[in-house]
């Protein structure tokens, strides 16, 4: 059984809007020239990657549920951003370790989602 919380249509729309804003923020911060984007010190570049994709995946799961197209799309987004960074030449470099951090954030969100669903089902 797949966990999907019972949300009102309005709550789903807000979740979808938050997902879209997070997606746009990730695209901007990932593809803008390196000197044009702020980089808060959260413990390193890989932590920022994992955190960004954790939040994006969590919002996507909230708004749309655990659909394969959502999870596959986020995976492709992470890979596509790294490829684009390697090709753009704007002071950014594509990095396989960044992709692993992106996927780690996505996997952590999915695991937490499943654990939450099991906990809710046990109640």
Name these PLM-found stretches.
Residues 13-14, 65-71, 95-96:
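Membrane-helix interface segments
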Residues 1-58, 74:
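"…centered on the first transmembrane helix and the immediately adjacent amphipathic helix/loop
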Residues 1, 118-123:
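Short, charged juxtamembrane terminal tails flanking transmembrane helices
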Residues 36-45, 81-104:
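Interfacial helix-loop-helix junctions of multi-pass membrane proteins
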Residues 51-68, 104-116:
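Membrane-interfacial alpha-helical segments at the cytosolic side of multi-pass membrane proteins
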Residues 61-64, 68-85:
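Membrane-embedded catalytic cores of phosphoryl/pyrophosphoryl-handling enzymes
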Residues 56, 73-80, 100, 104-108:
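Hydrophobic faces of alpha-helical transmembrane segments in multi-pass integral membrane proteins
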Residues 32-33, 65, 89, 117:
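Short helix-capping/hinge motifs at transmembrane helix termini and TM-loop junctions
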């Amino acid at each position: 059984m797949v966990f999907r919380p019972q949300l009102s249509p309005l709550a789903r729309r807000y979740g979808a809007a938050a997902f879209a804003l997070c997606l746009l923020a990730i695209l901007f911060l990932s593809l803008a020239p390196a000197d044009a984007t702020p980089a808060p010190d959260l413990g390193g570049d890989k932590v920022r990657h994992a955190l960004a994709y954790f939040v994006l995946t969590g919002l996507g799961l909230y708004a749309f549920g655990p659909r394969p197209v959502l999870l596959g799309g986020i995976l492709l987004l992470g890979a596509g951003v790294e490829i684009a960074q390697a090709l753009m030449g704007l002071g950014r470099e594509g990095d396989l370790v960044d992709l692993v951090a992106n996927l780690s954030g996505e996997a952590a969100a999915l695991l937490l989602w499943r654990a939450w669903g099991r906990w809710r089902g046990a109640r």
